[in-house]
């Protein structure tokens, strides 16, 4: 889990409601704390609910990361109107290239967003740090291994009839 890497342990325990009072103090002692030492840990439901909540949490996390990647890539390509575009049967000519002549420093934008935007977050902190160190993100694969959690979340949404286009 990322809790080890981030020092943000946020257990999402499930199980017998009768057992929770006996283990609550242990879970809350090791969990992250916010606002006056309030633990980031609560019992989330019966047996299996903790895994289910964590699965959906990770699906949301993947959606957020994808949104950052897509948005920052749009900013990164905002200078395409300056460059001579390729024209072929496979690539349509750009309409209105004059609208895409911005040379945007995505590392600076990510830093700005992480300091005061509604989308500021730990994930954006990591993104801004990575862009500052390596603005072109050279050497990165641009993909992550499939742990299955994203697919499980989408399958659960389909199974229970909840539209989840962002997570899909």
Language-model features and meaning:
Residues 8, 12-13, 22, 35-168:
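Helical "substrate-binding/catalytic lid" subdomain
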């Amino acid at each position: 889990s990322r809790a080890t890497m981030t020092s943000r342990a946020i257990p999402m325990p499930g199980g017998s409601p009768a057992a929770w009072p006996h283990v609550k103090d242990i879970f809350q002692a090791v969990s992250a704390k916010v606002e006056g030492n309030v633990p980031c840990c609560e019992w989330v439901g019966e047996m299996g609910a903790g895994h289910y909540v964590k699965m959906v949490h990770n699906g949301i996390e993947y959606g957020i990361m994808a949104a950052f990647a897509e948005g920052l890539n749009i900013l990164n390509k905002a200078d395409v109107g300056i460059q001579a575009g390729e024209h072929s049967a496979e690539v349509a000519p750009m309409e209105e290239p004059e609208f895409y002549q911005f040379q945007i420093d995505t590392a600076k934008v990510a830093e700005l967003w992480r300091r005061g935007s509604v989308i500021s977050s730990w994930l954006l902190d990591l993104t801004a740090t990575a862009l500052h160190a390596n603005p072109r993100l050279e050497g990165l694969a641009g993909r992550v291994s499939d742990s299955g959690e994203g697919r499980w979340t989408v399958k659960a949404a389909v199974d229970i009839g909840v539209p989840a286009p962002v997570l899909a």
